[in-house]
Amino acid sequence: MVKISRQAYAEMFGPTTGDRVRLADTGLVIEVEKDFTIYGEEVKFGGGKVIRDGMGQSQRMAKDCVDTVITNALIVDHWGIVKADIGLKGGRIAAIGKAGNPDIQPGVTIVVGPGTEVIAGEGMIVTAGGIDTHIHFICPQQIEEALMSGVTTMIGGGTGPATGTFATTVTPGPWYMERMLQAIEAYPMNIGLLGKGNASQQAPILEQVEAGAIGLKLHEDWGTTPAAIDTCLSVADATDTQVAIHTDTLNEAGFVEATIAAFKGRTIHTYHTEGAGGGHAPDIIKVCGEANVLPSSTNPTRPYTVNTLDEHLDMLMVCHHLDPAIAEDIAFAESRIRRETIAAEDILHDLGAFSMISSDSQAMGRVGEVIIRTWQTAHKMAAQRGKLPGDPNDARGGHDNFRVKRYIAKYTINPALTHGIAHEVGSIEVGKWADLVLWRPACFGVKPSLILKGGMIAAAAMGDPNASIPTPQPVHYRPMFASAGGALHKSSLTFVSQAALAANVGERYGLAKTLSAVRGTRTVSKRDMVHNDWQPHVTVDPETYQVVADGQLLMCDPATELPMAQRYFLF
């Protein structure tokens, strides 16, 4: 039997079972749990390699083969960290296993044929496309920025640079819903829109759901009173749509207890649950312990650093149309920015009490930094708090597989479950839409190499188009063919409500993208949040703002230096 060293094998085919990989320049290390390929039967494309006619490529018709195979990829997902070939067909994930030619190779579960394209995954990490559930659609250029960061699904609301959209993620009314659904046809991104949920009568809310909204947004700037909360959730229950809420910072219509009471145990997604982005001051953070609350953070407070507090005050004044000359507006802003609750937010993420991370794009958050900020938070917590239970600390330094699974779930499967789109996206699983992101380990979470939408490359880091090879400078992110023409419409989804799909909004509005209805939003609960389902009893001292969870005081120092930062963005 011919043997090969681990180093040589990894250099040729990528890491295998037991090998460890560092993520970017963080302190996070993952270990390959399983290898679905077969030693000695690996497939690889190129001159003198395996995927050639009569060798690793079969003679079978396209109907029996995958359209694309990603070879020898290292999959990082909530369900595992494994090495495998990935087969894509018809825009979806067809198989995860062993690719090749079953006529001459054993154990083949992914058939390669003359109709198969190859993407080399050796030495690459593959993740599911990110899902950002807190989007202010202030400008369409956000969409490209998000896509190039590895986000493939955006959920939120807005109409452009209108004052209401600067502050709230709302696409209000049927007319705007139709226009925005038509506008997003131009972009290679899965998108779902939220309507305005602030009303005390059901009819004006219901008509927005029927017009295409996948959910509703309650925002204090429109008046998030207990009556509005109750009415909005009643419509959501009737239509199987989700509600996202930004609660009452000033406690005008009641304190956090009144808001929890208005929920009446019904499922709701709480935005920026720590409170710096808005919500009952100073103790909105305590809702993360409720069984019906699905809590998320926005990325400006991720993670807590020495700069976090200073930048927040200026951002807040702009985003919520506040006047620095008015004392009450200054007091409003200062009530939201609390170092103690921001520090506690880091720890609550690490312990799995906060389930999701999103951006709050151009409205205090950065649309292209959801993934970066998530992994910076994971790194900071690993450095300050050590290994999580379940992650070993052996003579080789151990690995962080469980922590990595916990954090990747925050921007993939958990937002998908929350908003009723997990049947389509949110993980690398057979049958799901093939929205995949390929990363070099050194650039993981920062700069993806390829972004696939619906099984086709939509964006990539590409060199000079006039060069003799693809790699010469300047290399920057450019849209690829899945972002063009009719392929764009076939490669991306528009999410709508079941009521809108039944009302045939696609034909009525002249939409070309594939429409997919959200479902299961009213039965999801905190216990369904993958790796992030802890429900602590949280209290906040009204004078010191100190946060205690299940009797434990939550405190940590701000970071003075972070990975995944300046060294990646010099050019």
From Swiss-Prot:
It is an enzyme of class 3 (hydrolase). Binds 2 nickel ions per subunit. It is found in: Cytoplasm. Ni(2+) 2 binds at residues 217, 246, 272. InterPro entries: Amidohydro-rel, Metal-dep_hydrolase_composite, Metal_Hydrolase, Urease_alpha_N_dom, Urease_alpha_subunit, Urease_AS, Urease_asu, Urease_asu_c. One of its GO terms (molecular function) is nickel cation binding. Pathway: Nitrogen metabolism; urea degradation; CO(2) and NH(3) from urea (urease route): step 1/1. Belongs to the metallo-dependent hydrolases superfamily. Urease alpha subunit family. Heterotrimer of UreA (gamma), UreB (beta) and UreC (alpha) subunits. Three heterotrimers associate to form the active enzyme. This is Urease subunit alpha. The lineage of its organism: Bacteria, Pseudomonadati, Pseudomonadota, Betaproteobacteria, Burkholderiales.
